[in-house]
């Protein structure tokens, strides 16, 4: 006859093995879900482009069309979406600035057709944005219930800053 502690140990160990097995199947099932989405991103407007002392700042708005519904499955907890602006200057080899971000938790809201999205300014330490090419990139992280967080980049667009500073829309 086994004691109560031996029986409890057997049950806990068996439960742990079953849990690890289910989590392993969950991680392996990730290979069957597509991570590809079509995204269209473009500059809508440069609202302000100015300088103060030794830094430049700009407010831009973007247009975004994306259908992210294929990314939602039984293992998707949420999507972290963000748009980066990348540029190069003489002082910096590569600068990346987040200009918009959003956390998406529902599949019903995963079809995005937004105009004039604007959240964060582009701030460049130093002077080098005039007539500089900026690359907008849509990025997303798939945050699973269990498994590895994955990062993806899709949809890019480029635009040039004006050759002069401005306070009004360009």
Swiss-Prot record:
Glycosylation sites recorded in the entry for this protein: 131
Subcellular location: Endoplasmic reticulum membrane
Cytoplasmic side of membrane: 1-7
Entry protein name: Signal peptidase complex subunit 3
Gene: spcs3
Top-level taxon of the source organism: Eukaryota
Record has Membrane as a keyword: yes
PANTHER family: MICROSOMAL SIGNAL PEPTIDASE 23 KD SUBUNIT SPC22/23, SIGNAL PEPTIDASE COMPLEX SUBUNIT 3
Organism (species): Dictyostelium discoideum
UniProt function note: Essential component of the signal peptidase complex (SPC) which catalyzes the cleavage of N-terminal signal sequences from nascent proteins as they are translocated into the lumen of the endoplasmic reticulum. Essential for the SPC catalytic activity, possibly by stabilizing and positioning the active center of the complex close to the lumenal surface.
């Amino acid at each position: 006859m086994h004691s109560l502690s031996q029986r409890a140990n057997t049950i806990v160990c068996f439960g742990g093995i079953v849990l690890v097995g289910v989590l392993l199947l969950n991680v392996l099932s990730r290979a069957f879900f597509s991570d590809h989405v079509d995204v269209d991103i473009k500059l809508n407007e440069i609202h302000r482009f100015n300088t103060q002392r030794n830094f430049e700042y700009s407010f831009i708005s973007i247009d975004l069309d994306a259908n992210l519904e294929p990314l939602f499955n039984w293992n998707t907890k949420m999507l972290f979406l963000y748009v980066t602006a990348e540029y190069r200057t003489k002082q910096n080899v590569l600068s990346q600035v987040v200009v918009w971000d959003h956390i998406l938790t529902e599949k019903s809201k995963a079809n995005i057709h937004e105009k004039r999205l604007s959240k964060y300014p582009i701030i460049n330490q130093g002077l080098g944005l005039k007539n500089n090419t900026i690359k907008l990139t849509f990025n997303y992280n798939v945050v699973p219930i269990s498994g590895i967080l994955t990062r993806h980049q899709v949809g890019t667009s480029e635009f040039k800053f004006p050759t002069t500073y401005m306070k009004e829309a360009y």
